[in-house]
């Protein structure tokens, strides 16, 4: 919808050639073509003057000739009389099922001069006397070498000079195929650019009046492009992070980014993991029967959630549209052979499940009472959402679920992997209801919208964060059924040696990385009074974060320009929990010794009350804590003494602190020591401190869990961030040149020993105490 709006504004501004680059498969291109035809091109331009009552001619018209549901329902935009409205006609150079083809003799379809559209042929196309009479050309094109070569070739053959045509190139999935993946240090001269990157660069080179706008959900690859490469596609002028509407279910909807107590972790009212995530622990190597049992539980969830949807629609008919589709995604491999085998396995399990029998109903009743009923009752998911009181309410709808799933050929499974084009017709969400189980890989992991996705069975490991993010198809809008979503996630995939991968943890890490990245992009979104960007990315390329050592932000081939010098975002709290393993406790002793003088010298003041906004309820709450003011030089010495896990580099942060100090933007630090209800006072080597519980992460990630959201607002308010509701006490510490540190101490005994502070002895040693901090630089 956003880039449809951008195109509409571009047309109003006089752009007359619109090229939309989609993903690399036809399925994605046709989806985008349809969306633009429906929202922008409109009925009149699609009909092209054909009388919709002329049955012979209308048969060849997209949508109208195929009795498309949305076309018949009037959902395609209508512009009325274009000439009377003074609006340009839109010529479609591509169709619903046809990518770009060489125009040959029909070049006037692309050429305003050959089409005799110019009022003043002696003046350029862009001249005001001509531009408003000129038709708009729009091509929705796959990022495919053959297709793009045809388009470039036709553009070079038209009569109009390319530098006189105002053009807009919209690149959807801009991190895919567009980025040059050949390292210039290694590539031979004749292969210095990848084919798609070269063709896009050639397009931009020909279209002097062309503008390039890229869209992507995973922008990591794009910011690794070299800013100095004049022909590459670096986002040099602006980067805008589009805010998701409240109804969108993103990473935070399914993960617990804040530290939770043991009781909170088991409560679906508080914990998103408890509400939505179901662990997959079995492997075919060790126990194939248990793998079948886990997969059967996922199938049961799919059937039961479908029955609940149908029951809700019977109670509230307004929900029927939201439940037109109901799908389950199964994703565990990129191999087409594996997809076929998995589809057969699911088919066998479906038959063995015996849906509709008393035995199956007994399983579904247990699942409803033990899972779905509790999760639905735990929160106010949506206003007025019908809630089934018992399994008996939804049981009568199970038969209808089976009819919908098996309505075509009796097979509940569809494989989508590019092997057979006819498979796609079985999931044509526009033409018919789709209640199916979808098995696939790349075709389902990038761009293709899975309507009604409710149950996900996910076991595929990827080594790049952007690839893994694209597989997260459960993010999106779930009207009327957000409480029914279930993610069956592999929690113990074996890697090389003793390496074990937790996919849920991996998704959580990249979602947190993305949040940090988006927070940084806010800097690049700001504009000056004249509309110019306050900061251009080409001047300060944005940083990409990486929490998991094994999960790179993007492919190595897209990262050859990556080199981090310094990093830091003013007014944003950043956690630094990546400390080494406890070992013999010597690192803990060293870290505690660095901050010990602050307590010995009684630098912390009296207890004060700070505020925060609870992200779950929106209410303003408070906590207590004490503050110490530490000079910039002393803090620099303390921070320089901390040790980190292998692979984590703290030096860019130190260089940013040095730079802020040298520029006079950082004079001192306010160190906030929270005193929370969950803490317990302990005496550590003679120093009395509040001790908290923090979870030690496993070896693949290292360090501790992050800070709580409860202290974030106060820290950011101290640094001068005006929209952080930290309370009057926090704002009183703001000087405009003050950084803030959140300092906590966590029990860190030997593995297997008690970690709960309230159960530990009053006197402890520094070896059993972790010193953990988070930082925020001055906002100004």
Labelled PLM ranges:
Residues 436-439, 446-460, 485-486:
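A short beta-strand element within the Helicase C-terminal
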Residues 476-507:
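Conserved segment of the helicase C-terminal RecA-like domain
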């Amino acid at each position: 919808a956003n880039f449809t709006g951008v195109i509409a504004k571009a047309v109003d501004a006089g752009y007359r050639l619109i090229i939309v680059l989609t993903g690399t498969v036809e399925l994605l291109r046709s989806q985008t073509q349809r969306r633009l035809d429906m929202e922008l091109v409109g009925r009149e331009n699609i009909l092209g003057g054909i009388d919709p009552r002329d049955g012979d001619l209308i048969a060849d018209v997209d949508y109208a000739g195929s009795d498309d549901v949305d076309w018949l329902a009037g959902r395609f935009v209508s512009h009325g009389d274009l000439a009377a409205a003074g609006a340009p006609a839109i010529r479609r150079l591509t169709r619903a099922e046809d990518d770009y083809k060489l125009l040959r003799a029909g070049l006037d379809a692309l050429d305003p001069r050959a089409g005799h559209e110019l009022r003043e042929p002696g003046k350029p196309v862009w001249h005001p006397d001509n531009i408003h009479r000129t038709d708009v050309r729009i091509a929705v094109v796959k990022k495919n070498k053959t297709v793009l070569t045809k388009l470039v070739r036709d553009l070079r053959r038209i009569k109009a000079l390319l530098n006189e045509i105002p053009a807009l190139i919209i690149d959807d999935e801009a991190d895919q195929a567009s980025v040059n993946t050949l390292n210039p240090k290694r590539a031979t001269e004749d292969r210095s650019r990848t084919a798609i990157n070269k063709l896009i660069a050639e397009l931009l080179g020909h279209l002097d009046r062309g503008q390039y706008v890229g869209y992507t959900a995973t922008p990591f690859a794009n910011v690794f492009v070299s800013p100095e490469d004049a022909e590459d596609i670096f986002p040099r002028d602006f980067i805008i992070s589009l805010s998701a509407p409240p109804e969108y279910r993103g990473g935070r909807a399914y993960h617990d980014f804040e530290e939770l107590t043991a009781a909170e972790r088991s409560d679906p009212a508080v914990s998103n993991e408890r509400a939505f995530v179901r662990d997959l622990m079995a492997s075919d190597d060790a126990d194939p029967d248990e793998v079948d049992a886990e997969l059967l539980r996922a199938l049961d969830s799919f059937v039961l959630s479908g029955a609940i949807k149908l029951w809700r629609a019977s109670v509230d008919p307004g929900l029927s549209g939201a439940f037109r589709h109901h799908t389950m995604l199964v994703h565990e491999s990129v191999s087409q052979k594996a997809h076929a085998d998995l589809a057969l396995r699911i088919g066998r399990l479906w038959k063995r499940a015996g849906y509709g029998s008393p035995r199956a109903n007994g399983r579904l009743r247990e699942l409803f009472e033990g899972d779905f009923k509790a999760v639905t009752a735990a929160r106010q998911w949506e206003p007025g959402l019908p809630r089934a009181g018992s399994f008996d309410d939804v049981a009568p709808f199970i038969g209808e679920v089976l009819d919908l799933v098996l309505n075509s050929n009796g097979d509940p499974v569809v494989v989508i992997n590019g092997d057979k084009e006819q498979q796609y017709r079985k999931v044509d969400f526009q033409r018919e209801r789709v209640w199916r189980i979808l098995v696939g890989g790349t075709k389902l992991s990038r761009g293709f919208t899975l309507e009604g996705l409710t149950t996900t069975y996910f076991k595929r490991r990827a080594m790049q964060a952007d690839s893994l993010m694209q597989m997260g198809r459960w993010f999106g809008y779930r009207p009327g059924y957000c409480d029914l979503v279930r993610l069956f996630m592999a929690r113990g995939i074996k890697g090389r040696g003793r390496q074990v991968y937790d996919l849920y943890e991996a998704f959580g890490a990249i979602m947190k990385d993305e949040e940090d990245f988006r927070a940084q992009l806010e800097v690049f979104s700001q504009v000056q009074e004249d509309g110019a960007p306050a900061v251009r990315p080409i001047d300060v390329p944005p940083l990409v974060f990486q929490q998991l050592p094994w999960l790179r932000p993007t492919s190595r081939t897209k990262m050859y320009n990556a080199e981090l010098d310094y990093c830091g975002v003013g007014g944003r709290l950043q956690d630094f929990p990546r400390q080494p393993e406890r070992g013999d406790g010597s690192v803990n002793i060293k870290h505690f010794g660095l901050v010990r003088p602050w307590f010995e010298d009684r630098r912390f003041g009296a207890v004060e009350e700070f505020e925060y906004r609870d992200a779950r309820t929106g209410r303003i709450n408070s906590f207590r804590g004490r503050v110490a003011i530490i000079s910039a030089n002393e803090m620099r010495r303390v921070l320089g003494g901390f040790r980190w896990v292998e692979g984590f580099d703290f030096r860019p942060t130190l260089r940013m602190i040095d730079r802020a100090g040298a520029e006079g933007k950082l004079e001192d630090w306010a160190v906030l020591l929270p005193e929370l209800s969950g803490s317990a006072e302990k005496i550590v080597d003679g120093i009395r401190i509040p001790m908290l519980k923090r979870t030690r992460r496993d070896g693949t990630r290292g360090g501790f869990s992050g800070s709580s959201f409860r202290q974030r607002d106060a820290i950011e308010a101290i640094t001068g961030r005006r929209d952080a509701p930290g309370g009057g006490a926090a704002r009183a510490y703001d000087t405009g040149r003050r950084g803030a540190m959140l300092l906590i101490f966590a029990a860190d005994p030997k593995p297997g020993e008690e970690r709960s502070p309230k159960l530990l002895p009053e006197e402890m040693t520094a070896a059993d105490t972790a010193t953990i901090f988070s930082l925020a630089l001055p906002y100004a």
